[in-house]
Amino acid sequence: MKIGIIREGKIPPDARVLLTPEQCKKIEANLPVDILVEPSENRVFEDEEYEKQNVTLSKDMESCKVLMGVKEVPIMNLIPNKTYFFFSHTIKEQVYNRKLLQAILAKNIRLIDYEVLTNERGQRLIAFGRFAGMVGAHNGLWTYGKRTGSFELKRMKDHKDHAEAQAYYKEVKFPPIKIVLTGTGRVGKGAAEVLEDMGIQKVKPKDFLNQTYDHAV
């Protein structure tokens, strides 16, 4: 079976991708599957990184039985009679994607939406989690820095990976601001992880309210 990793077509373009080059190589080595990757200038991994793992690049996805992406696929890019995996944002009857769902039906496409994939206990397999919290905390502080002009911070998407972001945080000097982080679930824990990476001290609620600090807490 051939699986195609499609180029993200939604505007603005998304840099995310379903499988890393190493994951593609591992899947092909252990399963009766061939993976084709559609070239992309916007993907977080360069095309050459897939080629180095002997993963085939191809602009033609017609030969693939299954096509996998992240965001909604533009209607004009939908190939009839295929199985697609992506976040369609149609499950809650979102009006803005009604035409997309109609096109999927008209083209005899089987859509498998990540949003409704669950385990035997009915729990979602793909949902907001650690990485959503990490990106949210980072970009929240990026926004604060932009609005106040008190510090500079690159967007999370401009970092190659988490390790690069961690190294970058050591160069950033945050002003003495107070940050309230609510929630202790997967997203909250991801946000707390980034704040810790940034060197932002965690303090007790009473001290947070009553003490003055010369650094971010």
Give the ranges of each region predicted by the language model.
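Generic structural signal for well-ordered, non-membrane alpha-helical segments
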Residues: 16, 20, 43, 93-97, ...
